[in-house]
Amino acid sequence: SIETVMKGAEAMREFEPDWIIAIGGGSPIDAAKAMWVFYEYPEESFDNIIQPFSFPELRQKAHFCAISSTSGTATEVTAFSVITDYAKGIKYPLADFNITPDVAIVDPELTYTMPAKLCAHTGMDALTHCMEAYVSTCASMFTDANALHGIREIVEWLPKSYDGDHEARQHMHEAQCIAGIAFSSGLLGIVHSMAHKTGAAFENGHIIHGAANAMYLGKVIQWNSKDPRAAERYAYAVSYTHLT
């Protein structure tokens, strides 16, 4: 939340770290990214940084290391952060290559204790990252390679990962990371834009991001498939993952 970010930045200004190490799932790492901005620029306003690719130059005081313990957001390798304003019921996606971590530690053993439901939610987030990056108008040969391999890995290994299989958890942790590499350049689509908007809009608690993605993905595939290019790409992704 915005409140968490501001408290964390204040604490950082007190002990002045030269490295910021964020460990956890998407929410704590995303929060730490935003804290990093306000640690280095206390006078900066949140209203300014919600403008895409408008951040001040970071690494004036500290570098950033991200250690992911869930297999979904891939925030450890992306230029994005999502911060919630609970007072307004809004999720703000922050976007700037400045907040891409300097170091990412992707250790599958940290995911072995993930509950099955968390595994499902984060896994659907990773799958959505791949699908949206693959049909994006910003897709390229480089993003396609990561997105397609990520789709195939997730389709094969997510059910086994849900059941707690350690080999599957390893595959999922690596797949979600390459999904992040894919969408960092290929970008995302309306599944994520709707998931961010509706995810924080309910008074009695937000919709978990991966669940929101899962709710919208099928409908968006139907909508996007009205475009011949997107339809062709969806069809190829299905054949590539051996679903037919």
What are these regions (language model features)?
Residues E3-E10, E14-V106:
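Glycine/threonine-rich beta-strand-loop-alpha-helix active-site module
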Residues G72, I181-I208:
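Glycine-rich phosphate/pyrophosphate-binding beta-alpha loops
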Residues A200-L243:
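Gly/Pro-rich interdomain helix-loop hinge
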